[in-house]
Amino acid sequence: SMDTICPGYKQAYIELKSGERIALGNTGNKQEKRIEGMVLKEEKDGVMILPGDSLADKAVAVEKSWIVVPRGGEYQLILPDGTKVWLNSDSKLKFPLHFVGNQRAVYLEGEAFFGGRMRQDFCVDR
């Protein structure tokens, strides 16, 4: 008999520069979390990541954070510039809250699909 292959479940966490890991929700109930310079807004099509608006938020906004999807998971998120990212199982994406100047680069380990309002100068490093 063939084994049933189940799709990945929505699971991911943010790994902060300090090494702290914060689980991202998958409830779709529009909760908001404020973490180290960013606001995470749960939407039905993924978590929207926005820079916070306080001065302290802006001070850490240039730091890069990891979004990590463990093995067997999948996750959809929307970067601060509106780019949609579908991260597959066992993948990591590193991104800044603010892209500085014309450099719009993210770093990917694993597999992801990018879409939405991507501009031509968007770059994925591996």
Kindly give the residue locations of the regions a language model identified.
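Short acidic/polar, Gly/Pro-enriched loop/turn segments located at secondary-structure boundaries
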Residues: 1-126
